Amino acid sequence: MSIDTYTETLKINKLIEKATSHFQLSSTQLYKKILKNHEGELTELGAINVKTGKYTGRSPKDKFIVTEPSYKDNINWGDINQPMDEETFLKLYNKVLDYLNQKEELYIFSGYAGSDKESRLKLKVINELAWHNLFARNMFIRPESIDEAQNIKPNFTIVSAPHFKANPKLDGTHSETFVIISFKHKVILIGGTEYAGEMKKGIFSVMNYLLPIQDIMSMHCSANVGEKGDVALFFGLSGTGKTTLSADPKRKLIGDDEHGWNKNGVFNIEGGCYAKAIHLSKQKEPQIYNAIKYGTILENTVTNDDGTVDFDDNTYTENTRAAYPIDYIENIVTPSKAAHPNTIIFLTADAFGVIPPISKLTKDQAMYHFLSGFTSKLAGTERGVTEPQPSFSTCFGAPFLPLSPTKYADLLGNLIDIHDVDVYLVNTGWTGGKYGVGRRISLHYTREMVDQAISGKLKNTKYIKDDTFGLNIPVQIDSVPTTILNPINAWNNKDNYKAQAYDLIQRFNNNFKKFGKEVEHIANKGAFNQ
């Protein structure tokens, strides 16, 4: 099959220039379309509540990268970065473009990924659904004017057709759903799923390719900055506390999920926040709760007849979400960038209940835990996950990393050295027993520990090296019970603790073998009990 970039561009332009295609609509204009099309409902808080159908999380098994000659040797192919040949992609791409051309209305957004203009990606988003376009408007960086938007020549285009269902036998997919990235054609093609998070994570995957090949670190983390300009990064997978812990009233938010780190410092890749909304309350998370207002999208929350939202109701999913512009948070940095980090926090939700609530890592331990990326898959963030499961996600973001893990590890290691960054491992998971026996570590105590780490109070405090993991645990932290600092003390049965801990250590060792001899020096110095 032959189709050139010129032909594709003509088809894209035809979609954009259709009389019924709506370009750069405001939030109010999109609200009107959403309500008219019955895509969502208005809540008492002013936010729009939508349902994403049967897919309430990402579909990682349906994600592909096109095997184009100029790029294929750079990609870390495997279960995460699944290959699709170019001919198969182009056939499906044209089917989707023809499908969208028949739609009565389309919604177009132009904007950016990357708040540092030196490391910015120009975007165009073509949506079948009005609420998806509002999502794009909320999550990506918005141009300051219509004129600016019209003059954006995109480096990448998202084509989103959630109601187009693929035929696996004909289209080369695994199911009706597909998320396909083509670096040659500069397209992210999405179909068969209404879960809007595929758009944001698709662009993140693209940035995780484009930035590191320029020796710019890309990171699955949140970031904030204190009054003195001290910057903290929070690494962790969905549900481990990145959004919650970085939304600190005492510090200004840089971003809640995706960042780059270049010669100028840290910058947000996005223009919005995508916060978990399950059990959200004004008391526990006031900044996030106050962002649930006009312009915000709520995904899969339950509303009562009077329009009130029941954030505790998980009828549709545990993975309820709120998508809002970053300026809905009161304490933010504008633009969303800051200096080089002083502190890095690795967040993990340990379902075994054996990792300390906080420990200070050496450089080698930091690299070991960055490559390991231990956490637990939390309910709802992926299809098929209904309770926490221990897992390893390289660099705390394996589903979004197209390149070899060592590329990201080398970049981070160099930056830690250059800028003398303190690194801590923080367990936001369980204590006193594994999941189902123990309890979740109190958010209040986690905040206290993190606050004192990023303020520098823990930099020179007294530490003990625990016998089980070889981690440096603070002897005392103000306002935190000493009984929880060393996890063995929180278990009633010490033998059970040791058995569970050694089981986890063995899992770490087995997982690290996949990296081979290339990182043997990190394992020798950074692994548990070294």
Curated annotation (Swiss-Prot):
GO biological process, one term: gluconeogenesis
Molecular function via GO: ATP binding; metal ion binding; phosphoenolpyruvate carboxykinase (ATP) activity
Signal peptide: none
Record pathway: Carbohydrate biosynthesis; gluconeogenesis
Record: residues binding Mn(2+): 201, 220, 257
Cellular component GO terms held in the UniProt record: cytosol
Enzyme Commission identifier(s): 4.1.1.49
Cofactor: Mn(2+)
Stated family: Belongs to the phosphoenolpyruvate carboxykinase (ATP) family.
Designated name of the protein: Phosphoenolpyruvate carboxykinase (ATP)
Organism from which the protein derives: Staphylococcus epidermidis (strain ATCC 35984 / DSM 28319 / BCRC 17069 / CCUG 31568 / BM 3577 / RP62A)
Annotated gene: pckA
